[in-house]
């Protein structure tokens, strides 16, 4: 029996999903629901190619998380296998709370509660199905785990969420400004006092990342036609 599932991703190529907890998460109906939710909501009104889904984004973020854990480990940062699996689970589930049309729903039907809060509720529901196997992942997601850098990899200024969605949204919209060097940025990451840091030689890559993110907001996320469609 195969010990992993291989998924071919248009952005990063082959993504390996190990059998066990992570594979069970990918197959769970609540995560599979994201295969029917567009990553960019109504942005396809402007960029017809923007048909990619939250599920694809979750897989891409998982791939980058796997790369980040590998690189941090080679730099002498000790990460238990259980911690690696937990932070991978957390990034797979980080967007599970998104509803139809993505952020549009937060401003219409569901008000007063963020998709992050809904994500946490659904993670706890899945945790019951998996008999507590997500306890550590939920701790990391809620930033209640001592190794703060693990949460920062899931939700922070240089998290794997942002590194994926900029690359992915750039790919599917055709807006090349978002095509950041995610591999280079990940290689420049390190840990100091349990917090995520960047090596000095990676500063230029971070500057490019911040510029790319700003340009993507101008050209894609806050495009006047997309915003009007969502209103």
Protein language model features and the residues they cover:
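Sequence-structural signature of the catalytic-core scaffold of metal-dependent phosphohydrolases
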Residues: 1-38, 45-89, 97-231
């Amino acid at each position: 029996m195969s010990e992993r599932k291989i998924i071919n991703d248009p952005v990063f190529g082959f993504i390996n999903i190990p059998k066990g907890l992570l594979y069970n998460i990918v197959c769970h109906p609540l995560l599979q629901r994201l295969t029917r939710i567009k990553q960019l909501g109504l942005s396809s009104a402007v960029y017809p190619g923007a048909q990619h889904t939250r599920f694809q984004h979750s897989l891409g973020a998982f791939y980058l998380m796997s790369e980040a854990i590998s690189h941090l480990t080679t730099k002498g940062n000790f990460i238990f296998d259980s911690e690696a699996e937990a932070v991978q689970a957390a990034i797979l589930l980080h967007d599970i709370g998104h509803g139809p049309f993505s952020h549009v729903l937060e401003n219409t039907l569901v008000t007063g509660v963020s998709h992050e809060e809904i994500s946490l509720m659904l993670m706890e529901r899945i945790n019951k199905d998996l008999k507590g196997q997500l306890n550590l992942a939920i701790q990391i997601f809620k930033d209640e785990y001592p190794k703060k850098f693990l949460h920062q990899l899931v939700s922070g200024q240089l998290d794997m969420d942002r590194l994926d969605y900029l690359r992915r949204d750039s790919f599917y919209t055709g807006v090349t400004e978002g095509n950041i060097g995610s591999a280079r940025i990940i290689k420049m990451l390190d840990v100091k006092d349990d917090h995520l840091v960047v090596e000095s030689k990676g500063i230029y890559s971070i500057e490019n990342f911040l510029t790319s993110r700003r340009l993507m907001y101008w050209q894609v996320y806050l495009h006047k036609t997309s915003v009007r469609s969502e209103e």
